[in-house]
C-alpha cells in the first residue's frame, strides 16, 4: 500500500481560499483547556491529534483540505501547522456536507473519525517523565539539621524628645541572644 505524497499547491489559484475554515490540532485536543484553544468538550475531543489524522478524517467526511505546515498557532508559538478546510460549496454559503451545518459540528465529526481511525491514542513524549527515578532519590526523607536556639529580648528606651510630631510611645529595640 503506497501512501499519497503531499503536493505543493498554489493557493492563489483557488477561488475563495480565504473563506475556508481554519482548524488547528488544539481545537480538538482533549488534553487542553478551553483557554489553551480547545473548541469542543473533553468528551468529544481527541487526545493529542496530529495534522495527518485530521486531514484523513476530513477527507473521509468528503471535504477537501490543505495542510499548511508553515503556519503557527497564535496561542502557542512553537505549535506549527494547521488545516484549511473547504466547508462551503463554491460561491455559496451552503455546506458541502448537509449533515455538518457549522464549524463546531465539523470539529466534533473530525474527532469522531479520528477515534475510529486510531482508537488507541499514543502518549506524547514527555521528557519530565524520565526524571521520575531522580526525583524519587532526591525526595527521600531528610532529617532536619539542628538549628541554633535564639532568644529575643526586647528592651525599651525612653523617648528622647517629648515634643515630637510623630506618634508617641516607646521605641523598641530587638536584640538576639544566642
Curated annotation (Swiss-Prot):
GO terms for molecular function: 7S RNA binding. Keywords: Cytoplasm, Nucleus, Ribonucleoprotein, RNA-binding, Signal recognition particle. Pfam families: SRP19. Residues 168-178 have a biased composition (Basic residues). The keyword Zinc does not apply. Residues 148-167 have a biased composition (Low complexity). InterPro entries: Signal_recog_particle_SRP19, SRP19-like_sf. One of its GO terms (cellular component) is signal recognition particle, endoplasmic reticulum targeting. One of its GO terms (biological process) is SRP-dependent cotranslational protein targeting to membrane, signal sequence recognition. Residues 135-178 are annotated as: Disordered. Its main location: cytoplasm. It is found in: Cytoplasm; Nucleus, Nucleolus. Component of a signal recognition particle complex that consists of a 7SL RNA molecule and six protein subunits: srp72, srp68, srp54, srp19, srp14 and srp9. PANTHER family: SIGNAL RECOGNITION PARTICLE 19 KD PROTEIN, SIGNAL RECOGNITION PARTICLE 19 KDA PROTEIN. Component of the signal recognition particle (SRP) complex, a ribonucleoprotein complex that mediates the cotranslational targeting of secretory and membrane proteins to the endoplasmic reticulum (ER). Binds directly to 7SL RNA. Mediates binding of srp54 to the SRP complex. Belongs to the SRP19 family. This is Signal recognition particle 19 kDa protein homolog. It comes from Dictyostelium discoideum (Social amoeba). The lineage of its organism: Eukaryota, Amoebozoa, Evosea, Eumycetozoa, Dictyostelia.
Amino acid at each position: 500500500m503506497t501512501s499519497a505524497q503531499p503536493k505543493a499547491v498554489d493557493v492563489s489559484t483557488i477561488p475563495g481560499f480565504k473563506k475556508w475554515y481554519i482548524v488547528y490540532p488544539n481545537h480538538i485536543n482533549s488534553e487542553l483547556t478551553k483557554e489553551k484553544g480547545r473548541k469542543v468538550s473533553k468528551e468529544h475531543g481527541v487526545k493529542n491529534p496530529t495534522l495527518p489524522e485530521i486531514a484523513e478524517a476530513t477527507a473521509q467526511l468528503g471535504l477537501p483540505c490543505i495542510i499548511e505546515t508553515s503556519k503557527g498557532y497564535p496561542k502557542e508559538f512553537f505549535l506549527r501547522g494547521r488545516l484549511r478546510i473547504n466547508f462551503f460549496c463554491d460561491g455559496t454559503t451552503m455546506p458541502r456536507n448537509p449533515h455538518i451545518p457549522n464549524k463546531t459540528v465539523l470539529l466534533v465529526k473530525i474527532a469522531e473519525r479520528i477515534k475510529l481511525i486510531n482508537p488507541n491514542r499514543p502518549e506524547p513524549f514527555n521528557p519530565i517523565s524520565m526524571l521520575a527515578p531522580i526525583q524519587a532519590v532526591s525526595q527521600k526523607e531528610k532529617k532536619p539539621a539542628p538549628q541554633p536556639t535564639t532568644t529575643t529580648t526586647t528592651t525599651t528606651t525612653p523617648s528622647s524628645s517629648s515634643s515630637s510630631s510623630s506618634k508617641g510611645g516607646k521605641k523598641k529595640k530587638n536584640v538576639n541572644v544566642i
